[in-house]
């Protein structure tokens, strides 16, 4: 019994270092917000200007690696002996659901404004050229390239799960073929896992930092409650308490139902925006943007603006590549888990086609709506951002639609549910990763899950206290640096092991 109890408890070598590192960083930030902002700006500038090229090359190499998987010797290899667990339609729907977080709703509604007001390639701000390239860049940042990267890592994790029958809850578990049993279970593995978990907890905190202002701004619009940092903190606290109640009372089925509601409501809300904002314009703008993407793709892939030094690729492309890198392992583990029984080619094609369609629909509909509101002078986005902040500007793009009250209620419910499910997923992932063995069908300890949800909430509040998008962007970029190397190691470990166990026939 003692042994069983010990096995299901926390794993000290990853739990305590993570807790200490995150605690110290939060304390130093809160202690002096002005000094923290200076450090944040310095870190952002250093990483994006000195190492931005590495992120761009990584994405390009992973794109070619995707083609190797799809057309290479492993294309017809099956990931597990069983038939696919889910139908193709359900599988794609689950992938779409994973794309409808509140953070995605945040960027989808406002990103195009930044691209138009500070465009790439030396274009004039707010010019026709800037508007033509605006959506094309969104399709680039949220299109086949990053999903190809995820599909490769998903194949790697599915291989370790279903072919090699490994119990993978942390990235170090996959590194035995690359570094050997001794290093994969020693100090090296502890360092790798802590890099992964520190980056992941800050990534989750940034998502919460993006989502919370949307909910509080909705509350201000609907109920007239002023949006303050204190209200943000109260909302985050309520989410944490709600998550704790769900976990303690065994209401995980309710959380899963809420996740399904989020997916259906996302379809409904996107369909509403598509119809009432101008379906014809949206389709024309999308078609034109795909052409712009294909025409400028080579330059977008390698654009660093080393001569012009306008800062666009550093502020956006490098930031988004770091965003994709930092979530890669968590998302790939989830996508691998739902892909049991599929071939390598099926998984790669299904992910790239299904997930690209999902993100392209989101960005096209929401971005086109924002552009139309700006062009028709219905909204003054720059003024809204300057006077009230980015979240208010996003809320106003939804409030400007017909049946504004019903629309805002729908958006409020969508953001609220998306954030509840985010915190639930955060606490579950972190608890699983910082505990010893948790057998199939078992849940990680309640107090550990609640503890991590509290810490994620604190990080979200700290980032909100710093103000603006730069702290959020810097947290992602700084976290993406160590995971950049972890992702490469997982990829190389898969390739090395597959050569032995998936011998060419």
UniProtKB/Swiss-Prot annotation:
Cellular component aspect of the GO annotation: plasma membrane
GO biological process, one term: carnitine metabolic process
Keywords for this protein: Antiport, Cell inner membrane, Cell membrane, Membrane, Transmembrane, Transmembrane helix, Transport
The organism's place on the tree of life at top rank: Bacteria
Cellular localisation: Cell inner membrane
Main location: membrane
Spans through the membrane: 10-30, 51-71, 92-112, 143-163, 195-215, 231-251, 263-283, 316-336, 347-367, 403-423, 446-466, 475-495
Entry keyword annotation includes Aminoacyl-tRNA synthetase: no
Pathway(s) it belongs to: Amine and polyamine metabolism; carnitine metabolism
Catalytic activity from the UniProt record: 4-(trimethylamino)butanoate(in) + (R)-carnitine(out) = 4-(trimethylamino)butanoate(out) + (R)-carnitine(in)
A Pfam family annotated for this UniProt entry: BCCT
UniProt keyword annotation of Cell inner membrane present: yes
Membrane topology of this protein: Multi-pass membrane protein
Disulfide bonds: none
InterPro entries, alphabetized: BCCT_CS, BCCT_transptr, BCCT_transptr_CaiT
PANTHER family the UniProt entry points to: HIGH-AFFINITY CHOLINE TRANSPORT PROTEIN-RELATED (PTHR30047), L-CARNITINE_GAMMA-BUTYROBETAINE ANTIPORTER (PTHR30047:SF11)
Assembly and oligomerization: Homotrimer.
HAMAP family according to UniProt: CaiT
Task of the protein: Catalyzes the exchange of L-carnitine for gamma-butyrobetaine.
Family indicated by similarity: Belongs to the BCCT transporter (TC 2.A.15) family. CaiT subfamily.
Protein name: L-carnitine/gamma-butyrobetaine antiporter
Source species: Salmonella typhi
Taxonomic lineage of the native organism: Bacteria, Pseudomonadati, Pseudomonadota, Gammaproteobacteria, Enterobacterales
Protein encoded by which gene: caiT
